[in-house]
Amino acid sequence: MEHSKKHLGTFYGVGVGPGDPELLTLKAVRVLEACPVLAAPQTASGEMTALNIARQAADLEGKTLLPLYFTMSRDRAKQQEAHRAAADAVRPYLDAGQDVAMAILGDVSIFSTYCYLMDILKAEGFPCVMVPGVPSFCAVAARLGRSLTEANTPLHILPGGGEGPGETLDLPGSKILMKSGKNYPRLLEELERRDWLDRAGMVENCGLPGERVFSSLKEKPESSGYFTTIILP
């Protein structure tokens, strides 16, 4: 896309951390307060969790709010359609020279919807900037009082959803299973089969309302929400 020499807005991806508003960085607050347009994922029920966290740490009065809708379907075509639609919603503001900040849970580079939009808009010539945030699994480790890795110990970040981690569970070193809620019963079976329940720690909704902390899974908690992270030392 040709934009000639006209001024274009910048598309910022801003990590707001896992839930505790005190974990927003100074840079995240500055960028959120400076941008006239704020975008954020919105659920089917109307919740904008990332934006709600940001509101508790930054002054967002008078901003244009732009809800973005993303499908939970595993169908790749539907996912790509949602990404294009979200990019279409952001583009007019950037084209008009307005900066847009997209609030993202955790860190903007880890399982982030921002990156899909960034790829689309950057290819069209729009400037894009990523503002890192505190990753959810770092907050979970702190909540559990555990080290994630030391010395030469490898650290693996694995998706807990979809088809599950499978054989990657047997990789050497520490493992982080992110967004494990939907696959939780199956993951419990895998951990029990390996006799790992006692050493697995889990936090559900870290820093958010309804937070639950389990220093081990030997009691087999019955339910687990979408924002669930399991750590295996």
Task: List the model feature ranges, each with a label.
Residues L66-P67, S73, Y93-L94, N152-G166, ...:
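Short, basic, helix/turn surface patches
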Residues G106-L171, P221:
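Class I SAM-dependent methyltransferase SAM-binding "motif I" and its flanking Rossmann-like core
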Residues S45-E47, S73, P135-C138, L208-G210:
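Short gly/pro/ser/thr-enriched loop/turn and capping motifs at secondary-structure boundaries
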Residues V37-L38, S147, K175, I230:
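Short, well-ordered beta-strand core segments
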Residues M1-P21, L26-P127, F214, E219-K220, ...:
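Class I S-adenosyl-L-methionine
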Residues F11, V100, L169-P233:
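A contiguous loop/helix-start segment that scaffolds small-molecule binding in enzyme catalytic cores
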Residues A40-P41, P67, M102-I104, M130-G133, ...:
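General beta-strand structural signal in soluble alpha/beta enzymes
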